[in-house]
């Protein structure tokens, strides 16, 4: 795409410092220079703490609490925003430059309708009348591929999905036709399937309106779909800058090369392990049912979250559980831990039944099954020191106190590759990656047989997440611990797992070895997840959007049968008169995987090898 040669944004010698008033200041951004041409999308990429969001906010003349712009200039359309008065900055923000944040939920007032909030900026800046703003909002809803664009604005924020809310926040930012829009990690919290829709909508609207954009991210695969040029940052310094193709395929700086290497987790160790003999069974989950609400005549909860799910894991083995938000992954982990009592089924640990309610389990059973949650910020007490955090499970499970406890804390820190000095620090003072290592060390303090890892890398940037993955593999090799690894990232689950369970709407739709889920045929839902994982190449987004939005085969009314395939409404391979009339059964494929599908193995393989053609007319396999 051609861009005007004169820059819209010119950043020269930008320096940002942080610290307490009157105290010592630390430089966060070290004199960076870059430009953004009109109609261009520039990506700022780097790890957490690299300065990318700080730089992006400076384009609005803003510095976060405890920080200030200490030097340099930031010119937007020839005006240095660093010299503007508070009144002038208020007029600038939301009018000439707009901001799309990571958390759409935090950007909306739950007590006001969506439309009122989307048009508010246009009314404040008096760029149009209320009626004009409402019409413009509907145009944006349509351009952003939102459902029911004429009426969605009448809803409240809690009445739309996360992906829809993210696009509605984009409409809020774009309502005033800004010259520059800043997108700050806008898809980090989304599933891969939802991410495709949101990225495609953002890209389409930005290109159509001809505006400039800054895309802040730690994910190179996502940036490859959005940016014309990339600026690579670490420690507040620009390490490399260039066109997207050059950065992706011919990076010159070692730091950029490390970012690219972290995109695809290595699996050499997992390959070697996969060839070994099957380990002895440790955990066996049989027909687990969980949900909420009153009981039905069948004894099941009124709202079922898990629908007769099976899972089996051996000693020293990792079973990956993958699916979108709402698929039941976290509920399954909590059922295994006893935090959510199952209403049906059985859980065996070393062949012995585990009570379904955590209150009825013994201390020894609790010790053997530990859980590490996604968000270490909420899992750790921020005012407790690391030593105190790790000492508690040592005392509770093993009766270890005093000097012996301090020695064991030191050993645990060494295990998770943290320096000994961290022991005296409060957990709230640590980085995201350090907190997650402490979270893991706390679980290891119990000396468990099984650790339930619930999205343990999803809140971390690519490089830090890759380091945690490497740590998990190393700990498993040293300690023989088993993992249930829960994620929505197909690359991560393939990199660390021996076996993989695919959940959709609380049902197990596929189970197989890691190798079986590395190549088709898959269940149609597994194929969607695989196809939705971003690839490190420009143009992938357009290809993925075309695959994911292929027209579905029309079908008649469905039978009144709760056992029908849960993926029916989204499946590109559904068969009228079959999928909407009878429940599928688990079938075993040649590669050993089990899939819950009417389609034959040959149909699945043919469809997934030639996705553009489709094979809707082909008849299902005989039951």
Segments the model singles out, each with a brief description of its role:
Residues 7, 25, 150, 244-284, ...:
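Charged, flexible cofactor/metal-binding loops and thiol motifs
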Residues 47, 190, 194-267, 460-542:
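P-loop NTP-binding/switch modules centered on Walker-like glycine-rich loops
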Residues 60, 64, 337:
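Helix-to-loop junction immediately C-terminal to a conserved catalytic motif
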Residues 68, 81-98, 116, 124, ...:
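ABC ATPase NBD coupling module
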Residues 132-151, 404-421, 530-531:
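Conserved ABC ATPase "signature" region
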Residues 155-160, 164, 426-430, 434:
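Conserved ABC ATPase signature
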Residues 168, 173-174, 444:
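ABC ATPase C-loop
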Residues 177, 447:
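Conserved catalytic motifs of ABC-family nucleotide-binding domains
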């Amino acid at each position: 795409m051609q861009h005007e040669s004169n820059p819209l944004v010119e950043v020269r010698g930008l320096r940002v410092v942080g610290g307490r008033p009157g105290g010592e200041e630390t430089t966060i951004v070290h004199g960076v220079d870059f430009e953004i041409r009109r109609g261009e999308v520039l990506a700022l990429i780097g790890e957490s703490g690299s300065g990318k969001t700080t730089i992006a906010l400076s384009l609005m003349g803003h510095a976060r609490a405890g920080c200030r712009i200490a030097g340099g200039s930031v010119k937007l359309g020839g005006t240095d925003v660093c010299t503007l008065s508070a009144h002038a900055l208020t007029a600038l923000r939301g009018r000439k430059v707009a901001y799309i944040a990571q958390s759409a939920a935090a950007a909306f007032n739950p007590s006001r309708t969506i439309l009122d909030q989307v048009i508010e900026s246009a009314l404040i800046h008096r760029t149009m009348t209320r009626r004009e703003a409402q019409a413009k909002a509907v145009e944006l809803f349509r351009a952003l591929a939102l459902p029911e664009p004429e009426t969605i604005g009448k809803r409240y924020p809690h009445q739309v999905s996360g992906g829809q809310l993210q696009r509605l926040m984009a409409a809020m930012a774009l309502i005033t036709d800004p010259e520059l829009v800043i997108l700050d990690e806008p898809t980090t919290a989304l599933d891969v399937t939802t991410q495709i829709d949101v990225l495609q909508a953002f890209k389409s609207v930005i290109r159509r309106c001809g505006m400039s954009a800054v895309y802040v991210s730690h994910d190179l695969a996502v940036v490859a779909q959005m940016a014309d040029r990339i600026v690579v940052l670490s420690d507040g310094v620009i390490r490399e800058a260039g066109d997207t193709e050059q950065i992706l395929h011919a990076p010159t700086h070692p730091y950029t090369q490390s970012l690219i290497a972290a995109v695809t987790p290595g699996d050499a160790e997992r390959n070697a392990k996969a060839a070994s003999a099957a380990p002895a069974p440790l955990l066996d989950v049989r027909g687990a049912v969980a949900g909420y609400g009153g009981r039905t005549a069948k004894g099941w909860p009124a709202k079922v979250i898990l629908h007769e799910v099976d899972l089996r894991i051996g000693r020293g083995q990792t079973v990956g559980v993958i699916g979108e938000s709402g698929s039941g992954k976290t509920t399954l982990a909590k059922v295994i831990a006893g935090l959510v009592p199952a209403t049906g089924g059985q859980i065996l640990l070393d062949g012995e039944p585990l009570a379904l309610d955590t209150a009825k389990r013994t201390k020894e059973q609790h010790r053997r099954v530990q859980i590490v949650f996604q968000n270490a910020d909420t899992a750790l007490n921020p005012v407790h020191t690391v030593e105190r955090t790790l000492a508690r499970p040592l005392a509770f499970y093993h009766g270890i106190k005093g000097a012996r406890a301090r020695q064991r804390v030191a050993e645990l820190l060494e295990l998770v590759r943290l320096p000994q000095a961290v022991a005296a620090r409060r957990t709230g003072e640590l980085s995201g990656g350090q907190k997650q290592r402490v979270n893991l060390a706390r679980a290891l303090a119990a000396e468990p047989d099984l650790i339930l890892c619930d999205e343990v890398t999803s809140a971390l940037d690519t490089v830090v997440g890759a380091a945690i993955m490497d740590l998990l593999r190393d700990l498993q090799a040293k300690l023989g611990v088993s993992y249930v690894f829960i994620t929505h990232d197909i690359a991560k689950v393939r990199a660390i797992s021996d076996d993989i369970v695919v959940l959709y709407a609380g049902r197990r739709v596929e189970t197989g070895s890691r190798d079986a889920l590395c190549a088709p045929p898959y269940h149609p839902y597994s194929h969607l997840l695989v196809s939705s994982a971003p690839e490190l190449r420009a143009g992938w987004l357009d290809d993925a959007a075309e695959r994911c939005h292929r027209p579905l085969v029309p079908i008649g009314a469905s039978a009144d049968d709760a056992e029908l395939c849960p993926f029916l409404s989204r499946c590109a391979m559904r068969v009228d008169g079959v999928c909407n009339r009878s429940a599928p059964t688990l079938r075993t494929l040649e590669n050993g995987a089990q899939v819950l599908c009417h389609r034959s193995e040959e149909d699945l393989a043919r469809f997934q090898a030639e996705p553009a053609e489709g094979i809707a007319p082909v008849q299902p396999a005989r039951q």
